[in-house]
Amino acid sequence: MLSSVRLAALRAGKTNSVFQAVRAFAAEPAAAATTDAGFVSQVIGPVVDVRFDGELPSILSALEVQGHNVRLVLEVAQHMGDNTVRCVAMDSTDGLVRGQKVVNTGSPIKVPVGRGTLGRIMNVIGEPVDEQGPIECSEVWSIHREAPEFTEQSTEQEILVTGIKVVDLLAPYQRGGKIGLFGGAGVGKTVLIMELINNVAKAHGGFSVFAGVGERTREGNDLYREMIESGVIKLGDKRGESKCTLVYGQMNEPPGARARVALTGLTVAEYFRDVEGQDVLLFVDNIFRFTQANSEVSALLGRIPSAVGYQPTLATDLGGLQERITTTTKGSITSVQAVYVPADDLTDPAPATTFAHLDATTVLSRSIAELGIYPAVDPLDSTSRMLNPNIIGAEHYNIARGVQKVLQDYKNLQDIIAILGMDELSEEDKLTVARARKIQRFLSQPFQVAEVFTGTPGKYVDLKDTISAFTGILQGKYDDLPEMAFYMVGGIHEVVEKADKLAKDVAARKDESKKAKSSEALKDVPSLEKMAGEIKDEVIDADDSLEEDFKAEAISSENMVLNEKGEKVPLPKK
């Protein structure tokens, strides 16, 4: 137990400075206490119990610990009885001790909103973390807000063109809808999100908000640098021309920050939608980490785990976030959410619960990534409720279904091909396989954000060009072109150009091969003079041999032989 002197000192704010660090550009000090101050009674990792002598703060109220150079915000999660509230910390609790003074701000966590946030990076409590000075905003909003009323929501349906062929053709995104990117580790979710930010910002204008929830700090830094290079974010005097706000609560943050940073990003987006009437893009990478962070603190809050160890309030937590992402009569929020799939299991409770809220799903497949086809979008598993002839038109719908049919037929034939080989297929099936392989490769596309890694310039493909190209493939206009011509290109005109280039390269290689073979053959053939000399020598040798044979026969006919001196002598008598 603490001594009464020590406890009094702690309550007075005289705390040990061990573990305390000065955070540059910290937000303003805590608001004056609206009720009696409390003090820390228990610390269990990210969960802190605070005891109040007077009126208790309400659920979701923000409390601030006094005596820390680092601003430490606690959010009330439970009333425990005995004048004690249980809170979740938004930052590390290292150095926090029992008896430390805590004040109630009288409101939930509030963050700055408005154009002053554009081009800036903030954390879960609205503090800037980009070392660019304080965020200048005239308004602050609570991160806990009600979803728009049903009467305020819009029912209009319109496609958001992304410039990515496989998405626009087979699983188009709805403007003001919720889209999920499903995939395991390392199949390209973050790269696809970065490309979407790049394409939509350049093609459509408008503002974007990126919420980094529990992902790699390196990726967050890379995204920030690439946005600066591409002009989406501008620094200095031109910061007001920036098109994106970044809100980060990365892997190294405590679970409290990761559980609330998505709400902070959503609040910034809601301001642009409701006050400025903007069509806003909200990117969340990764929504699974939101669920995971709530799961981490759930047991410490005394909740009984449900399936696979997730919190029992999984559906409620996720629903509260997703219902705020919608289109109203004032503006829209289109949300693209990366969803990590644990062990590639789509039946896991976290991704399965997320499915219910989405208008479109883009499933990234490891088997397609292993073929070297990027983006590794599965054209058969990805879905969209926008793929409706009444919304996108009959032509787009028929071409999309035709492409999926060819790919499905190819998938059904793969077992036969693996066992019996291509030769056993009918001519019709062979044609289906050939077209399916071309479609599969044509669905690949070089990304602008990946240009520094691949060396291939990125491509933005208009929806009309995409539909026209796949129409030609299904009709057999490009059956004579090689498969490789369809790989990692933009429009169909690039396929034709690449096929011509490949044909010229093959012809050039054949000519070089013929020349090399003829030169090698000439090297092997001896010169005519050498051959004539060799023939002459052989003739002379043959003549000498014949002459000796004739002499021997003549001598033998005279019953004479040659002795050692070469003189004729009579044959010896028997």
From Swiss-Prot:
Chief location: mitochondrion
A Pfam family annotated for this UniProt entry: ATP-synt_ab
Recorded superkingdom: Eukaryota
Keywords from the UniProt entry: ATP synthesis, ATP-binding, CF(1), Hydrogen ion transport, Ion transport, Membrane, Mitochondrion, Mitochondrion inner membrane, Nucleotide-binding, Transit peptide, Translocase, Transport
GO MF entry, a single one: ATP binding
Localization per Swiss-Prot or TrEMBL: Mitochondrion; Mitochondrion inner membrane
Transmembrane segments: none
HAMAP family (alphabetical): ATP_synth_beta_bact (MF_01347)
Family: Belongs to the ATPase alpha/beta chains family.
Entry function: Mitochondrial membrane ATP synthase (F(1)F(0) ATP synthase or Complex V) produces ATP from ADP in the presence of a proton gradient across the membrane which is generated by electron transport complexes of the respiratory chain. F-type ATPases consist of two structural domains, F(1) - containing the extramembraneous catalytic core, and F(0) - containing the membrane proton channel, linked together by a central stalk and a peripheral stalk. During catalysis, ATP synthesis in the catalytic domain of F(1) is coupled via a rotary mechanism of the central stalk subunits to proton translocation.
Name of the protein described by the UniProt record: ATP synthase subunit beta, mitochondrial
Organism listed in the record: Chlamydomonas reinhardtii (Chlamydomonas smithii)
Origin organism lineage: Eukaryota, Viridiplantae, Chlorophyta, core chlorophytes, Chlorophyceae
